[in-house]
């Protein structure tokens, strides 16, 4: 992450001008009628699973890659991921006609490898863990001049995810609370920095899994920390350490952070 941190106004500009809709779609809000009736409230679900890669991760990846210079585009991009970020980078590269290399651990299931290849990514299998794959992606980036696309701790990635906040406010004027899952913090940071500038009375609440509550630990320590253990039960948010910039924004703009158990996730 660059030492020059965009201010709130710059994030607002980045979100409003984001080109993510060249590849992503405006996803609907689905009313959860049974839950709404049970709680006596209006509860809606943002259907990011309807994106081409079945995840919001496409937004941040595309926003980052679309902003690269012609020289950077010519050399290509690289990312380390065994999940949704991998597919987001692969599809973004294919859409923009940019070579996208995805480094994945050798333990990655074939179904995930095949999904990245179908999206147009060039898969490199390396190491037995994400950390080893990430180290290899950094080595290859330095060796070949590829641009490394971070999964969350990057202003352009954060702004891409923040387009969800823009859609939420445009789609439902009755919103009083927005609950956002937290892994590395990119989605929560982007949504919160947008919503709190335009409608500060809307509460934005981060939600963490009990086995990977890196934001709660960071808030207690006053800075991001490495978790000793990370549960893979909710593998999409299983992050050992959140980003510096995502922490800064979450600390400043989230109204609250709650931790949910595995049973509550399944409920």
Regions found by a protein language model. Name each.
Residues 1-267:
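PLP-dependent amino-acid enzyme catalytic core
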């Amino acid at each position: 992450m660059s030492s020059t941190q965009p201010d709130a106004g710059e994030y607002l500009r980045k979100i409003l001008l984001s080109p993510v809709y060249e590849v992503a779609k405006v996803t609907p809000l689905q009313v959860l009628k049974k839950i709404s009736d049970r709680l006596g409230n209006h509860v809606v679900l943002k259907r990011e699973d309807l994106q081409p890669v079945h995840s919001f991760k496409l937004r941040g990846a595309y926003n980052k890659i679309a902003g690269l210079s012609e020289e950077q585009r010519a050399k290509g991009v690289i990312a380390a991921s065994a999940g949704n970020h991998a597919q987001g980078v692969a599809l973004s590269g294919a859409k923009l006609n940019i070579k996208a290399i995805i480094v994945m651990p050798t333990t990655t299931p074939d179904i995930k490898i095949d999904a990245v290849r179908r999206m147009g990514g060039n898969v490199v299998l390396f190491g037995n863990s994400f950390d080893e794959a990430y180290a290899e992606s950094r080595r290859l980036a330095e060796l070949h001049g590829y641009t490394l696309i971070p999964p969350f701790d990057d202003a352009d990635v954060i702004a891409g995810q923040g387009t969800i906040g823009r859609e939420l406010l445009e789609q439902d004027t009755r919103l009083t609370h927005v609950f956002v899952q937290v892994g590395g913090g990119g989605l929560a940071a982007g949504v919160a920095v947008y919503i709190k500038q335009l409608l500060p009375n809307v509460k934005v609440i981060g939600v963490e899994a009990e086995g990977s509550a890196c934001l709660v630990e960071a808030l207690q320590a006053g800075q991001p920390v490495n978790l000793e253990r990370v549960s893979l039960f909710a593998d999409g948010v299983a992050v050992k350490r959140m980003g510096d910039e995502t922490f800064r924004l979450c600390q400043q703009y989230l109204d609250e952070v709650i931790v949910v158990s595995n049973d509550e996730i399944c409920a």
